[in-house]
Amino acid sequence: MRKYTVIASILLSFLSVLSGGHHESKAFPVVQQELFQTPHYIPLLENPPQIDVKAEMRSNLMIEAQVRDNSYQAFSAFLFYKQSNELGYKMVPMDPTPGAVRKFLAQIPKRLIWNSELEYYIVMSNGKQRVESETKKLKLEGYQADLAHIPELLITELAVDTKNIGRADGYEFIEIFNTTDRTIDFKDYHIRYRYPKEGPDSDLIWRPDERILIPSGETFVVWLKPAGHPELTSADFNRYYQTQLKEGKNLAVIDETEGMANTRPRAVVISTNTGKDISVAHYRKHALRRLSSVLYKYPLNGTAELLNISIGEKNPSPGTVLQAQVPDQKRKIKLDKEKPVIEDLTDRKPVRPAESIELRADIRDRSLVKTVAFYYRTDENKPFKRILAEKDRNDNLFHYIVYSPELIGKDQLEYYVAAGDGINEARTPVKMIDIKQTSKAHGLRMNIENRDTLSGTQFLKATTEGRADSIKLWIDGKKQVTEPAMEKEVYFAFDTRKTNLYFKNAVTMEGKVLKVFDDTTNKYRTYSVPLPETLLRKGKQLQRITIRSGSKVSPFDTAENRDDFLVKNARLVLSDGTVIRDQRVSPEKELFIGDNQRSNKSWQFQFNLPDGLFTSQLLEWDTSKLSEGAHHIQASDGKENVSLVVRVDNSGPHIEPNITEGQTYKGNLILQADMYDKWSRIEEAEASLDGESITLPYHTSSSDLLPGKHSLKVTATDLAGNKTVIERIFKTEREHPDQPEVIDSEADTHKAKLSVRVKDPTNDAMDVGFYRGFQYTARNHVKIFKHASLTEPPKSFVPERETPFTNKELERVSAADGKTVSTENKELFPYHRFEVTVDPSIDENDLAESVWKGSSLPGRKVTMYAWNYRTNEWQPVDSFVAKDDKPFTLKASVIAADFVRESKMNVIVQDEIPPAKDMYTFVWMSDTQYYAESYPHIFDKQTEWIKDNQKQLNIKYVFHTGDIVDDSADIRQWKNADRSMSVLDKSGIPYGVLAGNHDVGHKDGSYRAFGKYFGSDRFDKKFHYGGSYKNNRGHYDLISSNGNDYIMLYMGWGITDEDIAWMNQVLKKHPDRMAILAFHEYLLVSGNRSPIGEKIFKEIVKPNPNVVMVLSGHYHSAMRKTDELDDDGDGKPDRLVHQMLADYQGGPEGGQGYLRLLQFDQANDMVHVSTYSPYVKDKNYYDTDTYGNKDEFSLSLDLKPRIKKVETDYFECNVYTNEELGKREQVKSGDTAEFRWDHLEPQSVYYWYIIVEDSFNGKTKSPIWKFKTKKETYRPAPDQFDFRHVSNP
């Protein structure tokens, strides 16, 4: 009621202003409008004060007015404007300018401006007297059209709500205007009636029967005569509108139409026969006045979208246009003498009857190709069929499929292609495609061949030219009981359209599903279904076949929403091409199947097959009851005999792996298997090792495999379809040597003896290599800094305002002794950075290992990052989730080439301490497809509102759960979506998107267009973007707010097992973050999960205890479902998982901009969910009186802030160089290996390590050890002695 109260208030204010004087002549002139009687007269003020007016064109036209006289206190103001003298003034209420006195502001939305000149004046009132400004004219830039880009044909007027004839509008019409300097033949065009929500593929096509010629600069009217009224003539039309239009000259009639909707948004389009929109006229529901018309003007922006300049202001005037509707000059058409060039791309190789033929052509012309037609026939004695073809939006070619039912029983197909540009026409020569029909056999025959290999249940069939009951059949001399059958396959064919992807629509017979058709089909497509021979029985009065509308669960499901589609031309097609129909149904009658009001959930067809068609005898033969090997089959009809020998093979191939069950293997290992089949050949083979697929032979080693048991599984399938699976369990020992034990590092002044004891778990001899190393701690060559950053990790290498550790702090972290340094922050993410200065001799291939020891709080994840100089980013190298507050270690190794520059290496260890403030908000958008297609201003309104309310609502994040656009092949829609979502980019508001089914190729699932506009490169520089999967097919965002840490995990349309594995991997890496999962499809309109939703729930939601919420769209509804999950197996629920569906695209204007707000209330551990439309400024799409809290409710969620810290106990950096000092070979297990390191500097610290390897690829690296050489003792040289002080003996 709030909306209508506001409207009524404005209207009454408007009427009070208009209630006196000459102003009625300027006011909104509506023909036949009822006059309002107002009790109060507000006179015009004598000697009125001056009104100052200022106009400015921004995103909208802004007009501000102020009364100069301080004594006149206006409380209301209205702007009156017009854009053409042929149309009256329109009124816009003016709002008081905030913070100003006697100032008012009006906005005219840019979309309502269609002329370069605008005339306006302003009326103000204080309730007793009113003042009026002078009339002004305003020149507007950018509203002049380029004549060369104006469409050649315009829709200038629609009359969609006229006097009824019976129950239908009797005199609806479409007025067309020719803008060119030549007469246009309408044969290359047609009219399309469009449902904006469903797109062009669902258009109704209207083509007048008679030829239409539209002279230059003149109009032509098309009358949509209602169905069931053949008595109406053009005289009735002229009488109703008081016109003198002549049928065939400037009036055409389209009979038997359902007309145009009066109360729903629709579009009328003039299109070429190739599908190119020339003019598009939209009208919306509630915008029409009965018995009035809608007027349009040529577009100014070079598109086909006509400008709506008048709704309900004028009475219909078929055949007459206003000057404002059409350009001042005629568009000149250049002389064109070139014919289109046709390249026939049809594959003309012979086809089998069960196959279809696709006719394909590439057609080019300097002018617009307006008509393309395929002509074909399968009988040379009949005329060619003409099929108009539209350009395919995926490959820009022209296609038409001749489906198999038209080819069965035919020998060849003749065809040619014709194309025209409105002036010139080209055509190809007639070409032929052979159809390989099975040659008709004669005499007694069977459906198997001599020496065939058979298995399982076989249908043996014998046929003769005579009576079928004369046929007898024997197997191994034993007579068999048979039944009559048809020799060749029978096909059930039907045409269907408007089916939707993944709905399990089906053809069934006697309760058996013969075919599921679950593809998206907007245009009629023919399906052909072979019928099981066991279901077609002689003597049955009728063969009954059912087409069922399915849900996404099953063709027989009764609980969920069913698909709605149309079917026509259902028939049986016999092998000779004979067509048998259900006599109750006309072939061209469209049958509605589904669960809407005018549909049947299923339709059963009945066909009569004459007994004369059953010319065979059939045996259902179970070969598994016989021995394997050769068997003799005989058939006789009393005149002829047929004798065959077949092989029965019901056992699988023989497989012999080279692995012995239970044996232990060492060293290199080649896995392979011998395979053969006694009765036929091996058709398919595959193998796996420990569940992972491998290709035999497979090379591995005991050092590559974990110690313990392993499984080799080999599967082979033979020609008869028999399968054998063999599994061998084998073992490998612990192959790698034990960690070596340092014995001594006896250091002298210039040398040191290095001694280690080595052991191997299987007593193998080992080679021991001695290598140089380096080690750095807080005591030497390591500087440590502390700080807190806005993100985790920091975006820059060295953030500003870092603080170095004091000497006292450095001493505390120089040993792993429990003495720590802790850094905390109330707002940002604290970290410690370690800058290590390494020895200049370190090579780029050397390995640098960082070891950090410290502690955190239970449940917290602490991450170590190393700075990658090549990619200029902090790269995560190790992490740990603390189970308690006890110390733990982070350790990681990196290659010096990417992580050391100018002898410097940098590592940080980071955790977070977020703030605890007020409530924060996440916004959730979904299924914006119709905004991108038809209502981009609504899309803009959504994101602009999010930007404008970011601070007020404390908006931290925005979800989009897919169907960003309606047609992934339409670049215009992607550009609209890109522009709208860029508002969030420019405002710095974190958001994530995924691809819905409309964002990918409907048939091939291609993500190309999605990746171009919303791929990973759009997001990878944003602080919240955690990681991408297949160019943003999936991704995750990391968001923290008010002490709550989230991971937002997305996966787009067409989820596979590989996708699920990736999602589980990501969730396991972030167990300390609450996970909100986003998919396009998950919940159904019933509140249950869809099949893919159930799979996600079982394989992702349940195993990951941090998942708390799942969001989805796709289905036109709003639902929620909460599950209690027991994570620790004690029988008590440990968490709630809230699953929600929100998709409003089924509403007016594609959903009218409704979006979800999730407000997180930490004080009460609740998430308050509400629904709001910035476009209509209204809460709750679903009325609360009818639907209750469907759109507004609260969910329970633990939102207590979790305190975190980074606390360091010890840090060291170990560098393992490739500098080999020496080597000892074939050292026995348990023995000591020694090496003397010479040429050392005195009183110096040296680091070293060893690598131990055995001959079976076992390899172990030691820790880094150190020693210090002795101080050199000074001894004078002989020539330095003073012999004068040496006494003789």
From Swiss-Prot:
GO terms for molecular function: hydrolase activity. Keywords: Signal. The keyword Cell membrane does not apply. Coiled coil: none annotated. PROSITE patterns: LTD. Residues 141-277 form the LTD domain. It holds the Pfam family Metallophos. Residues 1-23 form the signal peptide. PANTHER family: METALLOPHOSPHOESTERASE, CALCINEURIN SUPERFAMILY, SECRETED PROTEIN. This is Uncharacterized protein YvnB. It comes from Bacillus subtilis (strain 168).
